[in-house]
């Protein structure tokens, strides 16, 4: 009886964790729900700087699409987190060489309360290089 209850509890916990799973595509689909900051930097300047900034933070670029202005980033599991998925969305604003950068940060598991919100550190690093609007 105890074994059956334990297995039921274990299956329920697994289902709960799996139901909150986030993929890199989910982070991209959440456009508009991240932290948005505008910078005095051309799209080209921002695009060429972002991989360096992400590397400094220990993040790995999983895929990029310059035409869409999308960098998809993954951070593996650690002692404190099951990992994170981050979408960095870059778009041109106006004709004066300004860009809008949105960072959407999601835990790899929806129930992952200790996942890092990468928006703040990414925007802090970018603000060291470019002036915010």
Label every model-predicted segment.
Residues 10-15:
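Hydrophobic helical h-region of N-terminal Sec-dependent signal peptides
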Residues 3-7:
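N-terminal export leaders
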Residues 22-133:
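Ser/Thr-rich, low-complexity intrinsically disordered terminal regions
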């Amino acid at each position: 009886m105890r074994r059956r209850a334990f297995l039921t509890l274990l299956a329920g916990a697994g289902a709960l964790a799996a139901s909150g799973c986030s993929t890199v595509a989910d982070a991209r689909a959440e456009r508009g729900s991240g932290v948005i900051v505008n910078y005095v930097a051309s799209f080209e300047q921002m695009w060429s700087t972002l991989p360096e900034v992400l590397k400094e933070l220990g993040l790995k670029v999983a895929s990029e699409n310059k035409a869409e202005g999308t960098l998809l980033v993954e951070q593996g599991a650690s002692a404190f987190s099951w990992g994170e998925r981050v979408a960095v969305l870059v778009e041109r604003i106006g004709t004066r060489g300004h860009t809008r950068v949105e960072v959407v940060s999601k835990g790899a598991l929806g129930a992952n309360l200790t996942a890092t919100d990468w928006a703040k550190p990414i925007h802090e690093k970018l603000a060291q290089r470019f002036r915010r609007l």
